[in-house]
Amino acid sequence: HHVNRCAAITEGSNGFPGAAGRLPAECATIGQVLQDNGYSTYWIGKNHNVPEEDISAGGNRSEWPLSKGFDRFYGFLGGETNNWYPDLVEDNRFIEPPSTPDEGYHLSKDLADQALRMLRDQHSATPSKPWFMWFCPGANHAPHHAPQEYIDKYKGKFDDGYEAYREWVLARMIERGIMPEGTELTPLNPMPEDMANKDDYVRPWAELNADERKLFARMAEVFAGFSEYTDVQVGRIIDYLEQTGQLENTLVFYCADNGASGEGSPNGSVNENKFFNGYPDELSENMQYLDTLGSAETYNHYPTGWAVAFSTFDSMLPRPLTDS
């Protein structure tokens, strides 16, 4: 990270050599390496590599994907975007989404549509040319947005709480040989007491009141629906490769950047931007959005307890550090 001057995310770049946020010429991207070796290169979805000051219609394009070894780009610049109304970029220009949520729009589907369009163009024009596609959907990063029918499929699935879910996941890991017999779960709050912020502590499920359990379980249902909906879109790409006889000659890597996020705070949020602005989430206020979680009316994120559960068997969570 320090050699490529990207020791922090672009929003945290400070100008010092190790964290300047701009790749030096001697550090090539995988796109540049493959492009130089005769590949077509495509980047779809999230690009969190462009400095903030360059993310504008008149901004410098030197750190944008087309300047970093990619023939085509379709997605968004930054850490996250609204899945119903995303800030879209095509190649080197900002664009409006091709349709609205009322017309069936969702970012995950749009990204898969564009990926398929590029792959079809490639297969039609230069079928013998190798290609590389970096497909990075906004999922499962917050905000957690999904079509209602996918959310409803998980109704009641998380009512037992995050501790019970952790136990279930660990048992399946041991059963499948992923973890050895005798493996024990990490503490629900793994930070040493002298380092922990008590306001960040995950409360045991048994200590939550009825409304909290209802809200927290619904947030997990939304996340699960979001996950499955995105899997379906990835599956469309895999299906196309199989239908065109390319799958057996394609390497598919599933990668994750940092696992489940703790940015939802112990109480979850109907608007994740509250966390970034230090605005507290009130249960009574959030309960008003119970039935609209995951829709265009919310910018929701699950509570930290689910981040702990969904990160089983990891002990720690990614979360921005503050001075407080």
Would you name each region that the model predicts?
Residues H1-S324:
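Formylglycine-dependent sulfatase
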